[in-house]
Swiss-Prot record:
Keywords: Cell cycle, Cell division, Cytoplasm, Septation. Gene3D superfamilies: SepF-like protein. PANTHER family: CELL DIVISION PROTEIN SEPF. Pfam families: SepF. The lineage of its organism: Bacteria, Bacillati, Actinomycetota, Actinomycetes, Bifidobacteriales. It comes from Bifidobacterium adolescentis (strain ATCC 15703 / DSM 20083 / NCTC 11814 / E194a). Belongs to the SepF family. It comes from the Bacteria. This is Cell division protein SepF. GO terms for biological process: division septum assembly; FtsZ-dependent cytokinesis.
Length: 160
């Protein structure tokens, strides 16, 4: 009965973790393997061979023509669910102007957090244009930023 009480108190957070919960049992039978080692692995054919498949070819739009950006997308999300549009555009290599004016501050923070993660994932950059407008660019787009005069440290993400 003492074991039950100890486990119950641990579960409810009224005591330290019950002893023995951190121990792992090895139920693995080391005599058998889960795969045949007699088979060899062959690499998949290159992309040129896969292009000759009978399936319809997918056309990829390339926003870079001659090394220049041919378009920039402006996104004005209303809810957090609209943030996926940012991810799609950045993933496709299209720079995004993210306008968060009129969005509740808590939602705006979540959208900026998501967008920063997407930009980090594609090795891009994010620049604040105004307190609620951001420029997000993929890695292949270089942004030249002119630093304004020092206004002092800004303590808020959306501060002037």
């Amino acid at each position: 009965m003492a074991g039950f009480m100890k486990n119950a108190m641990s579960y409810l957070g009224m005591s330290d973790v019950a002893e023995g919960e951190d121990d792992f049992e090895d139920d693995v039978d080391t005599g058998e393997t889960s795969f045949d080692s007699d088979h060899s692995v062959t690499p998949m054919p290159s992309s040129s061979a896969s292009a000759s498949t009978p399936s319809a070819p997918r056309e990829q739009s390339n926003p870079f023509q001659g090394g220049r950006v041919s378009r920039i997308t402006t996104i004005h999300p209303k809810t957090y669910d609209d943030a996926q549009m940012v991810g799609r555009a950045i993933r496709d290599g299209i720079p995004v102007v993210l306008n968060l004016t009129g969005v509740a501050e808590a939602v705006a923070y979540r959208i900026v957090d998501f967008s920063a993660g997407v930009v980090f994932g594609v090795r891009g950059s994010i620049e604040r244009v105004t307190p609620r407008v951001f420029l997000l660019s993929p890695a292949q787009v270089n942004i030249k930023v002119e630093e304004p005069e020092d206004k002092g440290p800004a303590h808020d993400l959306f501060a002037d």
